[in-house]
Amino acid sequence: MVLSAADKTNVKAAWSKVGGNAGDFGAEALERMFLGFPTTKTYFPHFDLSHGSAQVKAHGKKVGDALTLAVGHLDDLPGALSNLSDLHAHKLRVDPVNFKLLSHCLLSTLAVHLPNDFTPAVHASLDKFLSTVSTVLTSKYR
């Protein structure tokens, strides 16, 4: 999926509102995913998955940092996310459907925290962005 110029503008503007909360929003999205889609917990058997756990917060920071990196490289997502794609495909072997589930939870989290900025156009752009990130992260599964 190709991001239009308007999509890129919307994604950058929305992510600028996220600011220093990217890790917190990432952790909240993970918690939403674990609650809404309990099978996703199987990838984290060594984690304390309780609300506010240090491990979920740390992984949420990784998610937030990766998305911040992606927002900064919208014109070269495959290059920017190559190492993460390798990690998830070859070492962690995460089922690709889980990226879609996390994307859904990220959109919900952003909608809750940025209600005035989460317009239909921004929602559509963020959805396309997260879908593109998911595609890039699963590209090395083949």
UniProtKB/Swiss-Prot annotation:
One example GO MF annotation: oxygen carrier activity
GO CC entries: blood microparticle; haptoglobin-hemoglobin complex; hemoglobin complex
Positions carrying Phosphoserine: S4, S50, S103, S125, S139
Tissue: Red blood cells.
Record-linked Pfam families: Globin
Assigned keywords, A-Z: Acetylation, Heme, Iron, Metal-binding, Oxygen transport, Phosphoprotein, Transport
UniProt keyword Phosphoprotein present: yes
Residue stretches making up the Globin domain: 2-142
InterPro entries: Globin, Globin-like_sf, Globin/Proto, Hemoglobin_a-typ, Hemoglobin_oxygen_transport, Hemoglobin_pi
Modified residues (Phosphothreonine): T9, T109, T135, T138
Disulfide bonds: none
Keyword presence, NADP: no
GO biological process: hydrogen peroxide catabolic process
Job description of the protein: Involved in oxygen transport from the lung to the various peripheral tissues.
Subunit comment: Heterotetramer of two alpha chains and two beta chains.
Name of this protein: Hemoglobin subunit alpha-1/2
